[in-house]
Amino acid sequence: YISLRTALNSDEVLAVAYEYTYNGKTYQVGEFSTDGINAPNALILKLLKGTATSPQTALWDLMMKNIYYLGGNQIQSEKFKLNIQYKNDSSGVYVNYINEGAIKNQLLIRVMNLDRLDSRNEQSPDGKFDFVENYTIYSSSGRLIFPVVEPFGSHLRKMLNNEALADKYC
């Protein structure tokens, strides 16, 4: 994935050209400026972020929705705690579970696959965030990684296993 150190302004776009090898064959996406493109000809690139960012745009499905900046860097495991909460519509209280569907009363941190290990890194959830470098967190850059692609969308929808509830919570 690509992560920028500073956010783009709303009127700025991000596009790339790249080359990769698959099964011994080299492929190119877009054109490099060294390909002999001269002004005023257009340089063809792959758009990563346009000026409009909403679920209705074609780019929405290509965006990473599972990596979140925590607002700091050099995160230390012994000082870091994570809790995922949802504001209950009827009570107005923040809770760390959804009280309906196939995930009824399960901690959201567990539902999101962020609690699968105990303090000895054995397969036994303990109700605490699994601080696993390069899997659930990039501590040096302060990024939280959900190990599912769309944690609050398609993943939660699948876990709820009920279309009406999924429409309510996702």
Language-model features: locations:
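Surface-exposed, low-hydrophobicity segments enriched in Gly/Pro/acidic/Ser residues
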Residues: 1-170
